[in-house]
């Protein structure tokens, strides 16, 4: 059952954004990049989304939704909601939120287990977290 269009997932931070993408059948996730930008310069992240939309046919944008460990809304949650509104104003694309609790911790543990140095981890942690966010989303679509 092919879906054909891909899903792009983001782990949005204050000055970095991890990107990951699905295959066309929505079964496999791949880390794309860790994009660095000036603090709160979300326009540059919007432009980077445009770049990936030109590279791949994308039908859904999944944003990591940073709830607190207790499942409550936080200032970072509001930031991601604001960013989602910016995306919707710029593109006709379905935007969905995916709980991202502990994804960075999970990515960090994985990289530590591989013996990756701190410096190298900092260069890939967000794109790996985006991949985990996307995997979680894809798992909700299996049935």
From Swiss-Prot:
* Any single biological process term in GO: rRNA 5'-end processing
Superkingdom per UniProt: Bacteria
One GO term in the molecular function aspect is: nuclease activity
PANTHER family given for it? POLYNUCLEOTIDYL TRANSFERASE, RIBONUCLEASE H-LIKE SUPERFAMILY PROTEIN
User: Family assignment?
Assistant: Belongs to the YqgF nuclease family.
The task this protein performs is described as: Could be a nuclease involved in processing of the 5'-end of pre-16S rRNA.
Q: What is this protein called?
A: Putative pre-16S rRNA nuclease
